[in-house]
Amino acid sequence: MSAYRRPVALIVLDGWGLNPDPRANAVAMARHPNFDRLMARYPHTTLTASGEAVGLLPGQMGDSNVGHLNLGAGRIVYQTLVRIWRSIQDGSFYTLPVWRPVLDRAKQPGKALHLMGLVSDGGVHSHIDHLLALIDLAKRENVERVYVHAFLDGRDVPPQSALPYLERVEAKLKETGIGAIATISGRYYAMDRDKRWDRTEKAFLAITQGIGHTAGSVAEAVERAYARGETDEFVQPTVIEGVDGRVREGDGVIFFNFRPDRARQLVRALHETAFDGFKRPEGYRPVELVTMTQYDQTFTDIPVAFGPQFVDVPMGQVVAEAGLRQLRIAETEKYAHVTYFFNGGEERVFPGEERVLVPSPKVATYDLKPEMSAYEVAREAVKWIEEDRTDFIVLNFANPDMVGHTGVLEAAIRAVEAVDECLGQVVDALLAKGGAAVIIADHGNCDQMVDYETGAPHTNHTLNPVPCILVDDQRLDAKLKPGVLANVAPTLLEIIGLPKPPQMDADSLLVSNAEGA
């Protein structure tokens, strides 16, 4: 062990919000004896994990990317959603130089501009207002042929809410007179991130070959999907008849999602010369492509509208520079969050940083296996703690969020109960070594599984506060202030005994003697 002599962990119960309403509340309905005993024994408070508190727009729900950025940064990190929104408001969006090549290409004879991305106001991966602004941009630039390839949400917004969003897009296209919606596809297909290439292939074939289900109109496409029992997320790729909006060689393409992870696979299929995810019917066909943000550091030849913002001196760097060992551990669904995002949005591994990736189960939807890989994550973490192999741990339990997204209440309850059991195992191992833990959530989700107004499944995140428990037998009498996610890193540094760097402008949640006086 290090000179600090005890392990300290940040344990993220992803999607475990605190909802005062018990209705369809998986957290309230589940049995969680370990969480309850920790709340009863140790200091605790609540954290705001949405809106301006995490660098989003007021009333905007948080997500895991945003949450882990703020957790590791020790300051509020203003998100890309806000940056784009501000640029639209001040007009600078419409004059970004990055648009020029793709617009010029689309204006060439026989060419078109394709706008593709998630069409909703969920604000997690995209925002419909950004698409509408791009249509306005195309009109200003006299682009005559614009085709929208709309990916349906149903996850960060209600499961059957696509039509009003699509109607807004169609109204804007009619107003400008420059295009049409060419295809629709549920995000399950168009935005897979787990290398399930058969899903990506279906979306790709609809977009580039016009292969898939067909419908005479957008409304008919959605209605037929609902009749097949599909909610928005799972709508099979559908081509709108009478709109030949296939992406052809030399066309211009703007992918307007701002969150990278679920956009990468389709971009690879469209852009890479040596692509092996599936067989493309016509092989590689180059297009003029722009993405809203940097989707991957390996996409060096794809222009981006809003470049990455890096966080100087995140917590992982402070821990590394102190000579301490750190472990990042999660299953596949949240691995990027405890590594890339917690490290400030950069692909970097600090000295002494070890990573353990536990594969997520290969199931169609996680309600089929609510425990996911939580037991394996816990088992591995306990092993590292018992063997004195690490000083600081960042651990994420994905279940409350990922199962919450399915909208299946019974499964979400089982997910919470599985995580509670695993939480107890990890905390007990830490305490046996004289260690400490800060237990939090990065946002809510399974704390509301039904839309209280409509009775439909509620599959998106919530705006509810999240718990924060300081498990430390050396600080049983400590008091914690209410705070935000940015306060967590300074709190952890205080517990470890490391000074907070000046770049972290958030305070520790621990009430000082002066404050308590």
From Swiss-Prot:
Q: Which cofactor does the UniProt annotation name?
A: Mn(2+)
Catalysis performed (reactions): (2R)-2-phosphoglycerate = (2R)-3-phosphoglycerate
InterPro entries (alphabetical): Alkaline_phosphatase_core_sf (IPR017850), BPG-indep_PGM_N (IPR011258), Metalloenzyme (IPR006124), PGAM_B_sf (IPR036646), Pgm_bpd_ind (IPR005995)
What's one Pfam family the UniProt record gives for this protein?
iPGM_N
Q: What SUPFAM superfamilies would the database entry show?
A: 2,3-Bisphosphoglycerate-independent phosphoglycerate mutase, substrate-binding domain, Alkaline phosphatase-like
Pathway the protein takes part in: Carbohydrate degradation; glycolysis; pyruvate from D-glyceraldehyde 3-phosphate: step 3/5
The entry marks the following residues as binding Mn(2+) 1, namely 401, 405, 461
Which Gene Ontology cellular component terms are annotated? cytosol
Q: Name one GO biological process term.
A: glucose catabolic process
Q: What's an example of a GO molecular-function annotation for this chain? A: phosphoglycerate mutase activity
EC number(s) per entry: 5.4.2.12
Binding of substrate occurs at 125, 155-156, 187, 193, 259-262, 334
Record's cofactor remark: Binds 2 manganese ions per subunit.
Per UniProt, the keywords (alphabetical) are: Glycolysis, Isomerase, Manganese, Metal-binding
**Positions of transmembrane segments:** none
Q: What class of enzyme is it?
A: isomerase
The record's note on quaternary structure and interaction partners says: Monomer.
What does it do?
A: Catalyzes the interconversion of 2-phosphoglycerate and 3-phosphoglycerate.
Please report which protein family the annotation says this sequence is part of: Belongs to the BPG-independent phosphoglycerate mutase family.
Record protein name field: 2,3-bisphosphoglycerate-independent phosphoglycerate mutase
